[in-house]
Amino acid sequence: MRSVDNSELGRWRELDSIHVLRLLAEHVKEDLSFHPRSSHLTTRWHVHVAGHDWEFLCTGPKFWDVRMDCGGGGAVDLVMHIYGLNFKAAAKLLKDM
């Protein structure tokens, strides 16, 4: 795989985490009963991807895995988290989408 240029990395960094989840997941459902405590922009999502069920809090490009108590920001971080990939493999997956 050729290297990823900075403009592409920047675009992936800014992608809305919900958009990325919809591209990756077999099933995505927003929890409409969720009422955020801090940012009114935060939403909760139940997701099935890569054979696992996940529960994410999403605010723009940032995500928080409620069950694993960790998170990140940007499409590369999200792909790395869900699939357990390194940066290079996550970038390749995004590039191939």
Language model region names:
Residues 1-97:
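N-terminal structured subdomain of primase-like DNA metabolism proteins
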